């Protein structure tokens, strides 16, 4: 019971609980009198991050300007849910502007064009049709949705929303150009962009992906604690012992699966026996088969990422895939009096790039002045220290170490490192171990999420039954060959056919996805039959 309660307490400490958070200005008459003192931020960040930055920023504003400010956090879910909110709100806001302020007809062409990031506008507006005019008008307007900042999530959703026109340059780089020098915040590290070339979004802390491990659970299964590698998650001995999160609910989770694909593509390319295109195609297939094996071992696909380390720590699963923040946070929360923790986190060597969690000012921000102040604080050394300083250090968090790595290179030296919770994790020194190639999988990011849903999540029962049959019958070669058939989700199909499907209306996307899922259901059923029909004496590498 005590163990369960400690895990539950740790989970509550990390999870966002937005319905319990009441705006402070509802209880503070000083703030209620002045809406200009309220900053609205939409975020997927955890309650601990929101709490610590609220406390630190409010203190900063009191000390520097004598102002009482409040942050109203909006937490609809992960980045996927935030994107849906922004799409809905900006569509409604621009429709109102277009119809009621400009007096123009709202048509399907206008709706499809105004936020289309792939829409090509001519330089001159003389020959604009309604679609061109809508896109140009939106990009020149100050149409807002009552939110000032988008804070947290991976670089990809920020790039998408910048392309749509939702994000704008805050002007921070103009005021502080020295912060964006190579020696402080480089624009790119290991192939990952650290900020937008137009400064519409700026990375403020770093993230890597890795594996959280319960060594007691591995002992129970007779597995020696290995050097973490993505292939560990596909070990047949970990059947129903792997905790995964749903990539359709989070761009961050999708990014983790993208790391697996990129690592396999790099390994094949580095062999040197194939040209680049053939190597990428083979690496993609190998990566997809690894992802499906990991999916076959999955105990579940959680709707929120923080469940993964919580369940691994509790022994409900032996290992899990998670972002470094969750792994390190639970490692700290579950330490005993001697400093030992039943949860360990590690990033596979050469298995993950170092990417950023950005922040951006939204178009039409109602309180752009206060939003700028928050961003300025966030990128100052004082704000950056908050990410990984220990509780009790000067400039550190008040209640809980956030265990996130700051984006500023100039903090990874003394005297700052002495105060870090993770002083030995030096991301800029390890960046050359993995190079992210956006040209390889960047265009396939949406397809990766879509494919995993169609071949792992939707037919999960059939996938697990096939995998169990392979395990029970010692991986007969014909059944393994049938399992490894990824001809319906090749690299070429992902970049072509599936990418095209994802540009169509949601109904057509769903129809294609159901067909893909049904194909793999039948494939997994066939694998199960083949495995059970084998006498099990002939084995195959798996």
Spans of features found by a protein language model:
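Ligand-binding pocket segment of bilobal, Venus flytrap-like solute-binding proteins
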Residues: 130, 259, 263-339, 385-386
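Periplasmic-binding protein-like
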Residues: 179, 184-187, 207, 244-245, 288-294, 377-402, ...
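A bilobed periplasmic-binding-protein/Venus flytrap-type ligand-binding module shared by bacterial periplasmic
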Residues: 212-217, 354-369, 386-387
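Early extracytoplasmic/lumenal segment of secretory-pathway proteins
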Residues: 4, 18-159, 309
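Short loop->beta-strand "edge-of-pocket" segments that line small-molecule binding or catalytic clefts
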Residues: 40, 231-252, 260-267, 276-279
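Conserved C-terminal helix/tail region of periplasmic/extracytoplasmic solute-binding proteins
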Residues: 426-542
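A structural signal for short loop-to-beta-strand junctions that line the ligand-binding cleft
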Residues: 122-151, 163, 167-212, 231, ...
């Amino acid at each position: 019971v005590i163990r369960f309660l400690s895990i539950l307490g740790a989970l509550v400490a990390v999870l966002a609980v937005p319905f319990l958070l009441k705006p402070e200005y509802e209880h503070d008459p000083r703030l209620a009198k002045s809406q200009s003192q309220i900053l609205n931020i939409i975020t997927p960040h955890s309650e601990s991050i929101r709490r610590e930055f609220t406390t630190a920023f409010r203190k900063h504003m009191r000390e520097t300007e004598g102002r009482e400010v409040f942050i109203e956090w909006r937490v609809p879910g992960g980045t996927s849910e935030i994107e849906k909110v922004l799409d809905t709100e900006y569509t409604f806001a621009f429709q109102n502007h277009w119809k009621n302020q400009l007096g123009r007809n709202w048509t399907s062409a206008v709706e499809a064009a105004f936020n289309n990031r792939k829409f090509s506008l001519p330089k001159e507006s003389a020959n604009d049709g309604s679609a061109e005019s809508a896109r140009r008008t939106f990009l020149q307007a100050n149409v807002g949705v009552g939110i000032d900042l988008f804070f947290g999530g991976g670089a990809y959703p920020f790039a998408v929303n910048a392309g749509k026109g939702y994000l704008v340059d805050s002007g921070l780089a103009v005021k502080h150009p020295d912060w964006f020098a190579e020696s402080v915040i480089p624009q790119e590290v290991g192939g990952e962009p650290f900020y937008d070339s137009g400064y519409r979004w700026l990375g403020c802390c770093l993230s890597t992906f890795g594996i959280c491990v319960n060594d007691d659970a591995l002992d129970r299964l007779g597995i020696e604690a290995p050097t973490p590698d993505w292939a560990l998650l596909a070990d047949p001995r970990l059947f129903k012992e792997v905790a995964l999160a749903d990539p359709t609910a989070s761009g961050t989770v999708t990014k983790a699966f993208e790391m697996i694909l990129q690592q396999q593509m790099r390994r094949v390319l580095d062999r040197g026996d194939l040209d680049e295109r053939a190597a990428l195609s083979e690496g993609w297939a190998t990566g997809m088969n690894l992802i499906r094996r990991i999916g076959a071992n999955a105990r579940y696909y959680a709707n929120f990422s923080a469940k993964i380390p919580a369940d691994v720590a509790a022994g409900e699963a032996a290992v899990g895939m998670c972002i470094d923040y969750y792994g390190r946070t639970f490692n700290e929360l579950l330490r005993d009096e001697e400093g030992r923790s039943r949860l360990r986190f590690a990033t596979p060597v050469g298995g993950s790039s170092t990417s950023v969690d950005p922040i951006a000012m939204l178009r039409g921000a109602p309180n752009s002045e206060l939003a700028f102040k928050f961003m300025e604080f966030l990128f100052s050394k004082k704000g950056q220290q908050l990410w990984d300083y220990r509780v009790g250090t000067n400039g550190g968090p008040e209640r809980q170490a956030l265990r996130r790595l700051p984006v500023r290179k100039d903090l990874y030296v003394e005297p700052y490192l002495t105060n870090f919770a993770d002083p030995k994790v030096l991301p800029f020194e390890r960046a050359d171990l993995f190079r992210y190639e956006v040209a390889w999988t960047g265009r396939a990011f949406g397809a990766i999420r879509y494919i995993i849903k169609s071949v792992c999540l939707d037919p999960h029962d059939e996938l697990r039954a096939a995998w169990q049959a392979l395990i029970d019958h010692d991986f007969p070669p014909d059944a393994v060959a049938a399992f490894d058939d990824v001809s319906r989700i090749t690299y070429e199909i992902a970049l072509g056919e599936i990418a095209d499907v994802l540009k169509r209306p949601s109904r057509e996307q769903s129809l294609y996805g159901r067909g893909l899922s049904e194909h793999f259901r039948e494939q997994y059923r066939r694998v199960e039959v083949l495995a059970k029909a084998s006498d099990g004496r002939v084995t195959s590498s798996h």
